[in-house]
Amino acid sequence: MVSHRAARRKRASVTDLYKTCKQSGTCPPDVVPKVEGTTLADKILQWSSLGIFLGGLGIGTGSGTGGRTGYIPLGGRSNTVVDVGPTRPPVVIEPVGPTDPSIVTLIEDSSVVTSGAPRPTFTGTSGFDITSAGTTTPAVLDITPSSTSVSISTTNFTNPAFSDPSIIEVPQTGEVAGNVFVGTPTSGTHGYEEIPLQTFASSGTGEEPISSTPLPTVRRVAGPRLYSRAYQQVSVANPEFLTRPSSLITYDNPAFEPVDTTLTFDPRSDVPDSDFMDIIRLHRPALTSRRGTVRFSRLGQRATMFTRSGTQIGARVHFYHDISPIAPSPEYIELQPLVSATEDNDLFDIYADDMDPAVPVPSRSTTSFAFFKYSPTISSASSYSNVTVPLTSSWDVPVYTGPDITLPSTTSVWPIVSPTAPASTQYIGIHGTHYYLWPLYYFIPKKRKRVPYFFADGFVAA
């Protein structure tokens, strides 16, 4: 015997149960909290709303109206006010009968309205009467109506702004007025005033500066920072880098390219020098001094990677080659004498008292000086007597000549013929009757204490 289980019947809704069981007090325990909003979830929302403003979101235990502001439908828009314009007057519709004509005729009583001034009509056979007047006669227009003809009068006058006068004269004296548009006529008989010119240049001593004050220091132009972290430092030992830098990048022999300009290359995988791999550009050279050397530098650009858009990405390289050191040399160069060395017997003393006793000495008190001649081959000295110039009684100043020294000389003519006798020594003699000293020289401070002699009525013979 099979037992049949009774089918489960669905319970009524919470709202229907609450309406019937609330009054009798027989409601299930889960009905009243759901309807009255006293469940645990509703209490959590009530407690949290004390510190959190939920606004008009409609979250709570209310009646489900969306709070004070109500619900706003998603994607909706606010109400707009439509302006209604003035209404047109109704058009009277006239019915057309079957017997009425289909062609509407125009109104025959309507007149054409013409606008504009009427075209003047001239009546008469004599034509226009033209009257002329001078520059002083005012223009008079004949406005008297005439039934026979129309008279037109014209006035001729001379405008000096558009006509050149026959004789240009000096304008009259200018006047001072508050109006800036005050001018003087350019023709006619006018008076003029002669205004003398004034010299505005001030006199000076001639020592005024004629140029501006120069800068105290020389402003140095900032050069490229070759030794920064942005450049890779590569030393090139190949001397071809100075004259033919393209030979380090390409194998072919291109046409002549100047070495002092920027060189451009195509990226290659096989290059003669591995330091110049992926180089596409070499900038112009520069000479710098670095740590006591003269350095030849060039900046290069590598093209290591290419993006899809064609952008080249690569490092910047500083290639340099040290040419020569500029440090001072530790060696000392000994200077060589320009005059050949002589023996001891060829030397002489210019202050030696060696005079010829055969020559008479004048009785006047003078200072004696010896004169010698130097010769590298013949060790001999020739003395001359004192030369006394007749002087006045102002100061007793002797006049003498200095020694004549002949330096050794060589000749390229072969054979060399040595002189048999010393050449005649030329001396300087001063002849005169008197002389004078400029007294002002005694009071002017001088660096070297010497008195210049000025001889009058004399000459110098060599």
Curated annotation (Swiss-Prot):
Transmembrane segments: none annotated. It is found in: Virion; Host nucleus; Host early endosome; Host Golgi apparatus. Keywords: Capsid protein, Cytoplasmic inwards viral transport, Disulfide bond, DNA-binding, Host endosome, Host Golgi apparatus, Host nucleus, Host-virus interaction, Late protein, Microtubular inwards viral transport, Phosphoprotein, Viral penetration into host nucleus, Virion, Virus entry into host cell. InterPro entries: Late_L2 (IPR000784). One of its GO terms (molecular function) is structural molecule activity. GO terms for cellular component: host cell; host cell endosome; host cell Golgi apparatus; host cell nucleus; viral capsid. Highly phosphorylated. Belongs to the papillomaviridae L2 protein family. Minor protein of the capsid that localizes along the inner surface of the virion, within the central cavities beneath the L1 pentamers. Plays a role in capsid stabilization through interaction with the major capsid protein L1. Once the virion enters the host cell, L2 escorts the genomic DNA into the nucleus by promoting escape from the endosomal compartments and traffic through the host Golgi network. This is Minor capsid protein L2. It comes from Human papillomavirus type 18. The lineage of its organism: Viruses, Monodnaviria, Shotokuvirae, Cossaviricota, Papovaviricetes.
